[in-house]
Amino acid sequence: MEFINSSSNYFLNKSTYINLRWIGIIGQFLTINIVAFIFKFEFNYILSNVIVIFGAVSNVFLINYNRSTQLSNKIAFYYLLADILQLSLLLYLTGGILNPFSVFLIIPSVFASSNLNIKTNLILILITILSISVLTLYHQELPSPLNDYKLSNYYYYSIPLGLIIALIFLNYFAILFGK
């Protein structure tokens, strides 16, 4: 892909990125299992945990694959794309855009905006917007005690709209003031 070719000017600090991913993976694992076993909400927690394990395996691979202290623009793109897809799958299984953790979907592209080139970041923004749109229309039920909640369409569609506005706003300012 021409857009994501490596550049010596754009990179991610590998150790910072790995540590942030471990925080996310541990948080996902704890949240899934607390909701499943303590709150006893019904959802596909086995598949959800498999998706989190995929994230952990990719992080171990990242630690051992690249001995450099920096991730090139291209390598960082693929890992951030994997993060967006992993979180999108988790959100699909757990309520889609109605899941309160859906706000975390914008983090990979915001993180990239101050570290990677503009073309790579635009691709990540578009993929994130696509993910938000798909999760608005297609998802499993939001786990809840009685699985009984009603939202007006105004509120329901304001969530993805707010996420997309936040994504664009935060990326704009991170690109403008990030480096």
Region spans (language model):
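Short, Lys/Arg-rich, polar N-terminal cytosolic tail immediately upstream
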Residues: M1-L12
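Short, charged amphipathic alpha-helical "coupling" segments at sensory-output junctions
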Residues: N9, F177-K179
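Short, amphipathic, aromatic/basic-enriched membrane-interface segments that mark the entry/exit
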Residues: L12-L20, S68-Y78, L90-L98
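Alpha-helical transmembrane segments and their interfaces in multipass membrane proteins
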Residues: K14, I26, L30-V52, S68-A76, ...
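Alpha-helical transmembrane segments
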Residues: N19-F29, Y78-Q86
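Membrane-embedded alpha-helical segments of multi-pass membrane proteins
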Residues: V52-V57, L81-L85, P100-P108, Y157-I165
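Canonical alpha-helical transmembrane segments
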Residues: G55-Q70
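Alpha-helical transmembrane segments of integral membrane proteins
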Residues: A76-Y92, G96-Y138
